[in-house]
């Protein structure tokens, strides 16, 4: 049966995902940045309360995946922290200036991660040569690759995803970006074994007093009185679709 991973941005969201049938959680911060490394406090609270596998993302900033020496040092320290806290896996990825896997840095990450299952995230979708990259990731011992098939969403990239799955000795290929209940059957029918979804929605802040003339964001138009949460009903719906597909 296909595995359902839910992207979560808080301990509460991880619990919601677990309670509604998620098989695994990718734990992140900063949804508007596409997911950054969670704080130590969030990591500890999730480790204490969530029982399904949780893989934190290790990503120090938004933007591209070519990091300064200081950023890479922080990545290695965060990898060690996640390992020490007892998480079963993590999610990360580093590219060089030419859009190739930075093999030297990834080897250091893999050494720091030790027995943890490492997912190479959607840095893969920004790489220059996906098949060469897949070979490099297999050589590194990467457990899985999260990808949209190098398109803006995974449905558009499904043909590339299937090409990657068929590639000899490839890591597990997990489809992600825009995967929802309404299009999930396309991935299941194609034989995708792992899917990744935010299954989320923006929820209004409970704040009654709102200073509308002031923003804490560099984006003056950002809505600071909403937060991104996992929709438990959406998770349950996706899990049900997977179970019914398996029963066919």
From Swiss-Prot:
Gene3D superfamilies: Copper homeostasis (CutC) domain. It is found in: Cytoplasm. One of its GO terms (molecular function) is copper ion binding. It comes from the Bacteria. SUPFAM superfamilies: CutC-like (SSF110395). Its main location: cytoplasm. PANTHER family: COPPER HOMEOSTASIS PROTEIN CUTC, COPPER HOMEOSTASIS PROTEIN CUTC HOMOLOG. This is PF03932 family protein CutC. The lineage of its organism: Bacteria, Pseudomonadati, Pseudomonadota, Gammaproteobacteria, Enterobacterales.
